[in-house]
Amino acid sequence: MPNNYRLEKVSSLLKKEITLILQNDLENDLIRDHFVNISKIDLSGDLQHCKIYITSTAQEKVRTEIVENLNTAKSSIRHSLGKRIEMRRVPEIIFKDDVVLDKGLSVLKLLDELKNKNQNHNVEDKDAKS
């Protein structure tokens, strides 16, 4: 089993090369029209399987379609990867939508709502005391 340093190096290389493939080689208008970014790569310890989490500026429905398009084109992407990097075996890849950003934004929205409620209650309390 490779050490963590090797996993990090290979993950970094995969992220860099797949980003270049998405930007330059992939002929997909949906992906080109929306800013698609690789947020995280989970690489298995044996370097055989790779989950690629993407974020995009698109709405959730469009992001789902982008992920479907990427998974449809994954054999082409994997083939391009094989030409670009020297590995005994290019890992099997699967694309997933990274929902962490959405969850973080919803938490921030809830915190803002709570803050506004507290401010409104404080104003009402001050008015009642006056």
UniProtKB/Swiss-Prot annotation:
Disulfide bonds: none annotated. GO terms for biological process: maturation of SSU-rRNA. Pfam families: RBFA. One of its GO terms (molecular function) is ribosomal small subunit binding. Keywords: Cytoplasm, Ribosome biogenesis. It comes from the Bacteria. SUPFAM superfamilies: Ribosome-binding factor A, RbfA. InterPro entries: KH_dom-like_a/b, RbfA, RbfA_dom_sf, Ribosome-bd_factorA_CS. It is found in: Cytoplasm. Gene3D superfamilies: 3.30.300.20. GO terms for cellular component: cytosol. Belongs to the RbfA family. HAMAP family: RbfA (MF_00003). Monomer. Binds 30S ribosomal subunits, but not 50S ribosomal subunits or 70S ribosomes. One of several proteins that assist in the late maturation steps of the functional core of the 30S ribosomal subunit. Associates with free 30S ribosomal subunits (but not with 30S subunits that are part of 70S ribosomes or polysomes). Required for efficient processing of 16S rRNA. May interact with the 5'-terminal helix region of 16S rRNA. This is Ribosome-binding factor A. It comes from Prochlorococcus marinus (strain AS9601). The gene is rbfA.
